[in-house]
Amino acid sequence: MTGSYLPSILVPLVGIIFPGISMALLFIYIEEENIS
């Protein structure tokens, strides 16, 4: 029963969090490069 509604929560969550993390890391990398 738990497996049926788990993907519907997990897929949007991963779709939001993963780009968010990658954008944050990219932003930090660019900022670090500009400072130095």
Curated annotation (Swiss-Prot):
Compartment(s): Plastid, Chloroplast thylakoid membrane
InterPro entries (alphabetical): PSI_PsaI, PSI_PsaI_sf
Entry's Gene Ontology cellular component terms: chloroplast thylakoid membrane; photosystem I
GO BP field: photosynthesis
Superkingdom of origin organism: Eukaryota
Keywords in alphabetical order: Chloroplast, Membrane, Photosynthesis, Photosystem I, Plastid, Thylakoid, Transmembrane, Transmembrane helix
Stretches that traverse the bilayer: 7-29
A Pfam family assignment: PSI_8
Principal localisation: plastid
Membrane topology note: Single-pass membrane protein
Family affiliation: Belongs to the PsaI family.
Record HAMAP family: PSI_PsaI
Reported function: May help in the organization of the PsaL subunit.
Name of this chain's protein: Photosystem I reaction center subunit VIII
Annotated source species: Gracilaria tenuistipitata var. liui (Red alga)
